[in-house]
A protein has these predicted regions:
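Nucleotide/phosphate-binding sheet-loop regions of phosphoryl- and nucleotidyl-transfer enzymes
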Residues: 1-174
Length: 174
């Protein structure tokens, strides 16, 4: 079986971000729990017709299980959710060129839990709105402009100029 997921310091295999996070972890710096899917797994994904094969998926799920054990949180659990960020990386730094999805694991049930736990429903719904926008753009290839148009329309309807002036109910409607 090939190994697709690592926690080691290997820039060519892990990309710059993955290697830097691994190095910070090795130095004992406070880094959130995580794992890196290798550049070889990405190559395999394309060779498999843009599908994640069973072997890679099994290792990703194993890494998520390990994160759950360490954090005490569970991916997909509405009461104690594990939220993750997915960041792409290359060997060399390419600011603004690589995709990111924050708060993977949020859904309509989890966002309600997050709103109650944080005491800040506006923040929770804004996180969810941003997650949907990022996921739609990066994964579903739905352009950001459609979301920006909806936000602009909502601001116009509410008579406000800034996104931060929209309240939790506004963001929930979006």
């Amino acid at each position: 079986m090939a190994k697709w997921v690592y926690n080691a310091d290997m820039r060519n295999l892990l990309g710059g971000k993955g290697a830097n996070l691994a190095e910070m972890t090795n130095l004992g710096l406070p880094v959130p729990q995580g794992f890196t899917v290798t550049t070889e797994a990405c190559t395999q994904y394309y060779e498999d017709g843009r599908q994640i094969n069973d072997e890679i998926m099994a290792q990703i799920m194993e890494a998520i299980d390990k994160m759950e054990g360490i954090t005490g949180k569970k991916f997909g659990d509405k009461e104690n959710p594990l939220l993750v960020s997915v960041r792409s990386g290359a060997r060399a730094s390419m600011p603004g060129m690589m995709d990111t999805i924050l708060n993977l694991g949020l859904n309509e049930e989890v966002v309600e839990t997050l709103a109650k736990a944080s005491g800040n429903p506006r923040w929770a719904w804004d996180c969810y709105r941003r997650f949907i926008q990022m996921f739609s753009d990066v994964v579903m290839e739905v352009g950001k402009k459609y979301f920006e148009e909806l936000i602009d329309k909502m601001k116009e309807e509410k008579g406000v100029k800034q996104d931060v002036d929209l309240d939790a109910d506004d963001l929930k409607k979006l």
